[in-house]
Amino acid sequence: MSSHDNADSPSSSVANAVTAMKIEQHDGAADMLLSNGGDAVLKRDSNGLSEHAVTAKDYPGMNDLASSTVKSRTSSLTPIKTENGDSTAKEEKVGGDITVKMEPGQPPKLSRSSSQKVVAQPPQLFLHLPDSTAEAQSTFEVMETCTYANKYMGYTEHAMECDCAEEWEPSLSRNLACGEDSDCINRATKIECVGDCSCGAECQNQRFQRKEYANVAVIKTEKKGFGLRAETDLRPHQFIFEYVGEVINEAQFRRRMRQYDEEGIKHFYFMSLSRGEFVDATKKGNLGRFCNHSCNPNCYVDKWVVGEKLRMGIFAERAIQAGEELVFNYNVDRYGADPQPCYCGEPNCTGFIGGKTQTDRATKLSNATIEALGIEDADSWDTVVAKRPRKKKMGEDDEEYVDSVQPKSLDENGVTKVMAALMQCKEKWIAVKLLRRIERCDDDRVRHRVVKMHGYQILNSQLTLWKDDFNVVLQILNILDGFPRLTRNKIIDSKIESTVQPLTTCGDERVEKKAAALLQHWATLEVGYRIPRMKRDPNAVASVSQFGRREHTTDEQKRSQSRSRSRSPSLDAPRGPANPGRKSNGPRNSQHHGARQFRRQFNPLPPGWFAAESHGRTYYYCARGDVTWTRPIHAAPEAEVPGQQAKNKALQGIIDNILNAKENTPKEKTVTPGTPQASRETASLNEGQERWRSYSEEKQKKLYENTLFPHIKYVVDKFKHKLPKEDLKRYAKDVAKKLVNSDFKNNRVEDPTKISEKQQKKVKAFCKEFFDKAVAKHRAYEQRKAEKQAKGGNSKADDMISGHNTVEDDVKLSDGEAEKVEENDNSMSSDPQGILKRKREDEMDIGEGAAEEAMKRQKSSTPIPPPPPPPPPLGDEEQPTPNGTGEDDFLAENGVSMLHSPGSAPTPPPPPPLSTEHSDNDEMGQSPSMSNHLLEQKSFPAPLGEEYEADSGKLSSNRIGIEGQV
């Protein structure tokens, strides 16, 4: 082996190093191997004529080239096929992603390949490490949920409901709606369902709310400190833990950074929640804070909308085995922290966490945002377009990098990612890129998908967020103008009209014109009718109904995925019968499974008719007392109560008198106040005093009664010890009503809020005379009662009735007497005609009151049972004896039973007499000897007391009202 020295060659030029190599190509294959940081050796086959070795010491640029690689690759030999099929051209991969290409007659060339993947390695398990969860929890304060510096921190709009239906699985006793395989809109846009969704209670899209954390344990690693280990196997995208901590703003974040640095805290636990908001889990949090960093992670962090808050969770990136450490790529600048060494041990490890080393080499955008922007990784772009996207340069901003890459066109499947990213987007340049993808799309299916994925609600929030930038506003209005417009339902639900309305006067001519045209188009749409959703009370106790769910536990039952109701149904080709050759005249379903269904009565009875049963036969009756064996086909006649017409006429007369009295009552003339000349205070005072004129008559009477009450109470207090308390209160109310009605009837009330001194004296005098008479009557009643008790005369009930009438005589006062008291106050007690007149009117009032009470009792009491039918037919097995006492005995002896008894049905009367066609002795089981015995008696009593005479087969009643022949 001969060495080759070339000390004058530049160390930084890799091309010169390759060109300086002198390689002789022979028939055999030549391999060139360059190790990372090692020597480069050129080997030949056994028949080679010469060999040449190039070391890294000779060309220092080789070391720089090898050390500059980010991803290390294994060496491989990739031949290049030529047109004649000979593998004369060779590709040799040296360290990392560098390949040496050698072609006949051409110097070797170095090329960089970006499509090589990291070699898959088996996951490293940490089952040998002990569980250090208790020790780790002692280093911080455990929290269940995030705390917020103020109520506006972490706030986001949420008024969206999914269209999924409840899917109850009886075998699991769970609601499987909104699962991973479903088409749930909320789940696709990273929104959790709340209690008022149509998918039912406790659906599968409530993982944050129910804290469905994975089974994990804290372990203590050798170099990374505490870490998180999976105790069970995890499936892809499974929710592992929520990142819980204190949500603070940017000023507090920077202050805590300095504070923790002064305290000597090396490990910071800050995560960016949104623009200007951070989650600090340094001193308060949960086990999610122990999830370490890795350059090849098995987890990822995602943000979800839960209610009105934005929350952060850790999810599985791939299938994870039990014992693996749970890690995710921080992929962000550590907010000014110094870069730390990375101990993940992955082949693609950058060597540092945070700082410029990691930030400049990779974008800070999350994978979800990159996919939403249409920027895929290099491997995916190799199969999509011819031109591969370039990598991010050192020091290049994310916005500049995204601008330099052409995004993919938006398809129907990509709408979900775009709308989910737009829902949580707080960066303007990212929002503009996402909106541009939607705006450039002309496919109607994609636009329908955008509307379905809460398009109006999400664009409404973006319109509110960027309303000061007219370019972004105009971009959103153009998207809204391109939406398919069928109904106004989604527009009303999103409340976007109230956001667009102020834009018509914003000052920008383009925005004003576009907003006005959009509102005009929306106004022409109709509102589609939808069944209103039942409002659930969250505090109500859940009542389980036995008819709520029908749980079938058969093995053949299969669960259908929850699909959106707006999705078009699948079209199936029509099919013929399963077995067309089978012919059967028998019933299709001869076996009944379960309880029989309730069958409604085929031919119900006409209104007013009821049915009863006697000796196995059915007869019909009505409330008036009519009975028949024949089924009626017309409604039953109404039963007339005796004296009903007279009472109706009397009531109608009373109503007419009241109406006529109201018409004859003169209306008060409202005095129009003049133009106020006083100050504003006087005008407002007069307005308050005259307000009673706008009240109704009933309210004015109540106001006037309250004005009279103090003067009436003054008199009532004088009679406290002379009358019982209850009687005194009742008399006071009655006398107040009498005075108020009398004064209003005679137009003596000028102002119901005040009365003059003269009126006060008259009121007191009237009340004093009234109560004096009441006391005298009460004493007389007590004296008579004592005498009757001493003599043992009438019963106590009679005394109570007479006493009641006496008291009523004192209470009932006429309006004429009140007028007389007002005209002549001093002569009220000495006028016998007024007293007699009052007594006569009181007697009339008591008579009318008694009649009204009797009518009320008659209405509320049970109606009189109808009269019994004619006697039973001849030849019955059992007949009433001549000493029968009435209807009850007759029913008991004939064994009458109810067949159909509605709630309002009267007591069924006995069955009617059978006609000739119904009097078959053999069928009814009657005895001819009993019939002959009754005929020999010539007469027998009927249930109502009439006597019937039996002569030659003819029965006739001695009283009017019952006729018929048997």
Swiss-Prot record:
Reaction(s) the record says it catalyses: L-lysyl(36)-[histone H3] + 3 S-adenosyl-L-methionine = N(6),N(6),N(6)-trimethyl-L-lysyl(36)-[histone H3] + 3 S-adenosyl-L-homocysteine + 3 H(+)
Repressor is among the record's keywords: yes
SET domain sequence ranges: 214-331
Record-annotated Post-SET domain positions: 338-354
Principal location listed in the UniProt entry: nucleus
EC number: 2.1.1.359
Cellular compartment(s): Nucleus; Chromosome
Keyword Magnesium appears in the UniProt entry: no
Polar residues compositional bias, start-end: 67-87, 672-687, 924-934
Disordered: annotated segments: 1-20, 67-92, 540-595, 666-691, 782-966
Key words of the record: Chromosome, Methyltransferase, Nucleus, Repressor, S-adenosyl-L-methionine, Transcription, Transcription regulation, Transferase
One Gene Ontology term of the molecular function aspect: histone H3K36 methyltransferase activity
Cellular component, GO annotation: chromatin; nucleus
CDD domains tied to this protein: SET_SETD2 (cd19172)
UniProt feature, compositional bias: Low complexity: 1-13
SMART domains: AWS, PostSET, SET
Annotated ranges, domain AWS: 157-212
GO BP: any one term: methylation
Biased composition (Basic and acidic residues): 548-559, 782-823
Residue ranges annotated for the WW domain, each copy included: 603-634
EC category: transferase
InterPro entries hit by this protein: AWS_dom (IPR006560), Post-SET_dom (IPR003616), Set2_fungi (IPR025788), SET2_Histone-Lys_MeTrsfase (IPR050777), SET_dom (IPR001214), SET_dom_sf (IPR046341), SETD2/Set2_SET (IPR044437), SRI (IPR013257)
Homology family: Belongs to the class V-like SAM-binding methyltransferase superfamily. Histone-lysine methyltransferase family. SET2 subfamily.
Domain notes: The AWS and SET domains are necessary for transcription repression.
Chain's role: Histone methyltransferase that trimethylates histone H3 'Lys-36' forming H3K36me3. Involved in transcription elongation as well as in transcription repression.
Protein name: Histone-lysine N-methyltransferase, H3 lysine-36 specific
Taxonomic lineage: Eukaryota, Fungi, Dikarya, Ascomycota, Pezizomycotina
Gene name of the encoded protein: set2
